[in-house]
Design a protein with these regions (language model features):
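C-terminal active-site subregion of NodB/CE4 polysaccharide deacetylases
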Residues: 1-85, 239-342
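A structural motif corresponding to the C-terminal end of an alpha-helix
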Residues: 65-71, 103, 215-227, 256-258
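Conserved radical SAM core fold
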Residues: 39-40, 116, 232-237
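Carbohydrate transferase catalytic cores enriched for Leloir-type hexosyltransferases
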Residues: 116-118, 127, 257-258
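Membrane-embedded segments
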Residues: 85, 89-97
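Short amphipathic alpha-helices and their capping/turn segments at secondary-structure boundaries
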Residues: 18-26, 98-101, 212-223
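CE4/NodB-like, metal-dependent polysaccharide N-deacetylase domain
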Residues: 90, 99-110, 163-200, 226-230, ...
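Extended, charge-rich helix/loop segments that form flexible
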Residues: 34, 121-224
Length: 342
């Protein structure tokens, strides 16, 4: 009911001109938008969006609506333009995006080191394999014997996969800092083989969704005006790691050329990004870093810059991007950061 009321409010504000007014009131605020995967609808396994997914149609709509108010550039110091970013570094993030958006749209891809030159879907980021397991495992009861699992008996039905992800798999993953989730994944594989999970997906889906960019592709993307940034080595929640593990994820394996570029935290919310992680990012030489929150709250600095995740609904998209929703929730305008790359 609440969601319906918000959608109705967004619709009224759009057609009444209030949204346009808030675009003007927030003209000094730089908009950075986060995307993850853009996958053709016909490739989705069982029609499911596993993880953060846009279809080609939903992504195209968002780009068209953005362009009504902003040019799209990679200039983070230009508040008059909007910057689009893509987290993780899977093949679809350039291949499908560039096809849909056209050559005039350039973005920033934040890549996890584990995915560079990785063409093996069974060795994708652990968190993505866990999501595919819980979404595609057949209905039934599975017994998981692993130290960090919060509930050993998994009863999977058609309608409870999101609940199981949020309340069982995700907290069990976060607690598994010793193996960064690989031990948990092996335990699930023992209960129902991962190869059987991925067999439900088409080869083209697996290539686009679960294989990474090659070094040659990264060079080509850069030549075409895109930017490649760092997104840690293995995409594990940083706040759950030791200081040594954090430095490995953030600094040790980061290519030198990426350290002059903005950094993106995996997950990018308060529980996954602690102060120590932000300090390591700064000391490693990155000029700034992005969160996945519109309001960074008390973390008001250029090492936790805000990003928008846009709705698939046109009216909610403008309600959010204009800053009107933010104003109604917080009684203030969007935060302004002057020249974060300086």
């Amino acid at each position: 009911m609440k969601h319906i009321v918000v959608k109705l409010l967004a619709y009224i504000c759009y057609w009444s001109g209030l949204v346009s007014m808030f675009y003007a009131l927030n003209k000094k605020a730089k908009r950075i938008v986060t995307f993850h995967n853009v996958i053709p609808q016909n490739l989705l396994p069982n029609g499911k969006k596993i993880g953060l997914i846009d279809t080609e149609d939903s992504f195209d709509m968002k780009i068209r609506e953005i362009k009504k108010h902003f040019p799209i550039t990679n200039n983070l110091n230009d508040a008059k333009s909007l910057t689009i970013t893509f987290d993780d570094g899977y093949c679809n993030e350039y291949e499908v995006v560039s096809k849909v958006a056209g050559d005039d749209v350039k973005g920033i891809i934040f890549i996890s080191g584990h995915l560079i030159n990785n063409n093996n879907p069974t060795d994708a980021l652990t968190v993505d394999l866990l999501m595919h397991w819980i979404e595609l495992v057949p209905n039934g009861t599975y017994f998981i014997n692993y130290p960090t699992i919060v509930h050993r008996e998994l009863v999977c039905t058609q309608s409870n996969r999101k609940f199981l992800w949020q309340n069982v798999i995700w907290p069990s993953f976060v607690a598994d800092s010793l193996t960064k989730g690989k031990g948990l994944l092996a335990a699930l594989d023992g209960a129902y083989p991962m190869k059987n999970i991925l067999a439900q997906c088409s080869p083209e889906y697996l290539r686009l969704r679960l294989t990474g960019l090659t070094s040659d592709k990264i060079k080509l993307i850069r030549k075409r005006g895109w930017v490649i940034g760092w997104h840690t080595e293995e995409h594990f929640p940083l706040s759950s790691l030791t200081n040594k593990q954090k430095k490995y994820e953030i600094d040790t394996n980061a290519p030198l050329e990426m350290k002059s570029i903005i950094f993106s935290y995996p997950y990018g919310e308060y529980l996954s990004v602690d102060l120590e992680s932000q300090i390591i990012v700064k000391e490693s030489g990155f000029p700034c870093a992005v969160s996945n929150l519109v309001d960074p709250g008390s973390i008001n600095n250029k090492y936790f810059l805000p990003r928008f995740t846009l709705s698939d609904n046109k009216y909610l998209l403008h309600f959010e991007l204009s800053g009107m929703k933010f104003f109604l929730m917080h009684q203030k305008f969007l935060p302004v950061y002057n020249n974060p790359l300086v």
